[in-house]
Amino acid sequence: MANNKQIGARFEQEFVEILAKEGFWAHFLAPSPTGAQPFDVIAMKYGCAFCFDCKTSVKPIFPLSRLEDNQILAFDKWLKCGGHTPCVAVKYDNKIYLINYTRLQREGSVDLRTEKVWREVKE
């Protein structure tokens, strides 16, 4: 059975592959030796850059507290520099949800059961 880190790493790769199939240039940002990284994936399409953090969840409620401080700081800086709103790609129950970061910040948590599914995936 895979541990949380392995499950997360698999989802990050899966998400990059899905974006590439959708016509994006997508790149996984490898963590530094200390494990820190600003976010997991940067992608571009039609001249617009996007950033994503990838999370897996076994619970339907996804809280802002799942983001690390360095990720929040990076998302905030991205917005200040004029980037498109960052998203958290959450994989829950074999579905991927794209959660708008500013909404997550405003509301504190999101109930995935009420969200639009971005992609269904097979295990």
Residue ranges and their predicted role:
Residues 25-47:
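Active-site metal-binding core of divalent-cation-utilizing nuclease and nuclease-like domains
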Residues 1-32:
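Acidic-basic catalytic patches of nuclease active cores, encompassing PD-(D/E)XK
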Residues 19, 41-43, 47-60:
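Conserved catalytic cores of phosphodiester-cleaving nucleases, focusing on short active-site segments
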Residues 29, 51-54, 89:
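Short, conserved beta-strand edge motifs with alternating hydrophobic and charged residues
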Residues 58-72:
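Active-site-adjacent loop/helix micro-motif of nuclease/hydrolase catalytic cores
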Residues 76-104:
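Nucleic-acid nuclease catalytic cores
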